[in-house]
C-alpha cells in the first residue's frame, strides 16, 4: 500500500506540467477568440451587422496612396475630425449622406442619432485610411474622403449597406457611385436602418 502511494506521488511531477500546459492553451485560445470578436472597426462584433463578412470582403480595398488618419471626434454619421499628417482636419465622407443630428436649433432627422452612434462606435479613437477623389475639399473646407476601417472595411459602403445613409452623388467625385447606388437599393429593399423607419411612417400614414 505504502509502495503504491509512493509511486503515485513520484508520478505527480510528470503530470502537473502537462496539466499546466493544457490550461495555458485553453486560456490563450479563449483570449484570442475574445480579441477576434471585438477586433477591427472600433470594437463591434461582425454579428451585429446586417451585411455578411463575404459581402464586405467584396467591396474595394483602399488604394495604395491612401493615407493614415487618427479619428479624434465624430460629428455625425458622415462627418468626423481626424489628425492627418500632423494636421487636424474635418473629414466629410464621399458619396453618402446620413440624416442630420448636430444642429442644436433643429430637431434630429429620423435615424440621425442612430447613424451618429453607429459612426462613434466604429470611428472614435480609431486609425483609418483615407483616399480622395477629383475634388480634395468641399465648399465648407472639409476634406472629402473615402474611408477604410483598420480591418479593411470600406466605411462609406458600410454606411450605405447597413441602412444608415442615402446616396449623395456630387460630380466629379463619382468613383464609387455605382456601388453606393446598389448598396442603398439593397438596404432599402431589405428594410434596414432608416429604411425600416421609412416603412413605419408609410404604414402609419
What are these regions (language model features)?
Residues 2-205:
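Small beta-barrel nucleic-acid-binding modules, primarily SNase/OB-fold domains
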Amino acid at each position: 500500500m505504502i509502495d503504491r502511494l509512493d509511486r503515485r506521488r513520484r508520478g505527480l511531477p510528470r503530470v502537473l506540467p502537462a496539466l499546466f500546459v493544457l490550461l495555458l492553451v485553453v486560456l490563450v485560445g479563449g483570449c484570442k477568440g475574445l480579441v477576434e470578436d471585438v477586433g477591427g472597426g472600433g470594437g463591434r462584433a461582425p454579428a451585429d451587422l446586417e451585411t455578411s463578412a463575404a459581402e464586405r470582403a467584396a467591396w474595394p480595398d483602399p488604394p495604395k496612396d491612401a493615407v493614415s488618419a487618427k479619428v479624434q471626434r465624430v460629428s455625425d454619421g458622415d462627418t468626423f475630425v481626424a489628425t492627418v499628417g500632423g494636421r487636424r482636419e474635418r473629414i466629410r465622407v464621399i458619396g453618402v449622406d446620413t440624416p442630420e443630428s448636430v444642429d442644436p436649433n433643429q430637431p434630429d432627422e429620423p435615424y440621425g442619432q442612430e447613424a451618429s452612434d453607429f459612426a462613434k462606435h466604429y470611428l472614435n479613437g480609431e486609425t483609418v485610411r483615407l483616399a480622395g477623389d477629383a475634388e480634395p475639399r468641399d465648399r465648407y473646407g472639409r476634406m472629402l474622403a473615402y474611408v477604410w476601417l483598420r480591418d479593411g472595411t470600406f466605411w462609406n459602403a458600410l454606411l450605405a449597406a447597413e441602412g444608415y445613409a442615402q446616396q449623395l452623388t456630387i460630380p466629379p467625385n463619382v468613383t464609387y457611385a455605382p456601388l453606393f447606388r446598389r448598396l442603398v437599393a439593397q438596404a432599402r429593399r431589405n428594410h434596414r436602418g432608416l429604411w425600416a423607419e421609412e416603412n413605419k411612417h408609410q404604414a402609419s400614414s
